[in-house]
Amino acid sequence: MAFTNEQMERYSRHIILQEVGVKGQKKLLNGKVLIIGAGGLGAPAAMYLAAAGVGTIGIVDADEVDLSNLQRQIIHGTADVGKAKVKSAKETMNAMNPDVTVNTYREFVTSENIMDLILSLIHI
């Protein structure tokens, strides 16, 4: 996989690091991460993972954005109030980095569905 000029510029700070380099950035772009919850911890994690160029990110959350969420769940904005958190998060992440594929799961995580959620991301 060759980087586009835009990707070279976007990921330049990773690429110049010996510990990451071109090889490491390619691993990130081919990486997959599942985030449980798009709230106080999941929201900033999702933004950083998208900005870093993690290629496929799954987000699981059954909740909707509430006005009281906005001071700490920075992935959501005022216009997102009432919207599913996974939809709001996906929109923000895609706007931030079009290289990232975001898969949403609007459901609660349970002991019965956790393996299916993980496997669905692995097999994408």
Label each region the model flagged.
Residues 1-122:
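Adenine nucleotide-associated cytosolic modules
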